[in-house]
A protein has these predicted regions:
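Generic structural hydrophobic/aromatic packing signal, biased to beta-strands
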Residues: 46, 50, 179-181, 235, ...
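A generic structural motif
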Residues: 13, 209, 262-266
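Intrinsically disordered, low-complexity regions enriched in small/polar residues
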Residues: 3, 56, 76, 85, ...
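Compositionally biased, intrinsically disordered low-complexity regions
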Residues: 25, 43, 99, 124, ...
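Compact mixed alphabeta submodule
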Residues: 242-267
Length: 267
């Protein structure tokens, strides 16, 4: 017995497997599950369902991010080609329905069976590993996340390539400021990027800005004045940058500046 999927169907299954089935967020999984029954009013019914079943509220940033994930608008322009076929939703008046291409996929019972099994697997992983959220975030303390996971779960409109993040990045729209630290520094990196980020206690960290910054730089000020500016600073740490397998960071929660900042020149 051979299961036959079209090229588009295979790509959709690959996308769900690679991007969503880890269960790091419930939203897209429950959305896909609902599309097996409902073809219209998808986002409105999803918001209601998540609120009732998971006590999970979708604000405007979250809604936009989920829609972008499901319409191939979240990836960077270079990455859009990879899953060009993976557009699951289309705009309908003040909500979304399923896209014509996805509706065609759903006419294949074999595709539907694989999709449902994959989505149920993702939902079970979410419940076991990712449902115990830290405060009001979509993140779980001490779980591992990639750069892309962080951009998605902080509800950014678009993904950012790691090179553009380079240690930290402020997203104006969501007012989130993730910091990514490589804790195990290598000897062969340039002196200007050999930042001396290190923990001085289990809840205190010395973190160095990007090179070429002063106390007056906008990114430095956003960090130092995060509380008064309403900026949400989140910390992600990985032990070794050469971790070729996962390239994931441990999520360590929110951080605030102590007010003891010093300016210095790298040797």
């Amino acid at each position: 017995y051979t299961i036959r999927l079209s090229e588009d169907e295979e790509k959709a299954i690959e996308f769900i497997s690679k991007k969503l089935a880890s269960g790091k967020r419930i939203h897209e999984l429950e959305l896909l599950k609902r599309t097996l029954q409902y073809h219209h009013g998808i986002i409105g019914s999803l918001q209601k369902h998540l609120s009732e079943k998971y006590q999970c509220e979708m604000d405007e940033h979250c809604t936009e991010n989920v829609v972008n994930m499901m319409t191939n608008e979240f990836p960077t322009s270079a990455a859009k080609k990879t899953y060009a076929q993976c557009v699951f939703l289309k705009k309908e008046q003040d909500d979304y329905g399923i896209s014509d291409s996805y509706e065609k996929m759903l006419q294949n019972p074999e595709f539907c069976a694989i999709l449902e099994e994959l989505v149920d697997f993702g939902i079970s992983r979410y419940k076991v590993n990712y449902s115990y959220h830290y405060q009001d975030t979509n993140l779980v303390l001490y779980q591992k996340y990639t750069y892309e996971d962080a951009c998605r779960l902080l509800n950014w409109e678009r993904n950012e390539v790691p090179l553009n993040i380079g240690g930290y990045k402020y997203d104006k729209k969501t007012k989130t400021f993730p910091i990514f630290i490589n804790y195990d520094k290598q000897d062969n990196i340039s002196d200007t990027t050999k930042y001396e980020d290190h923990f001085v206690a289990e809840n205190r960290l010395i973190a160095i800005s990007k090179s070429g910054r002063s106390m007056d730089s906008e990114d430095v000020q956003n960090f130092l004045k995060a509380t008064e500016r309403g900026i949400d600073v989140q910390l992600f740490v990985r032990k070794n940058k050469d971790d070729k397998i996962s390239k994931e960071f441990y999520y360590l929660g929110r951080v605030i500046a102590t007010g003891n900042a010093k300016q210095f020149v790298m040797p």
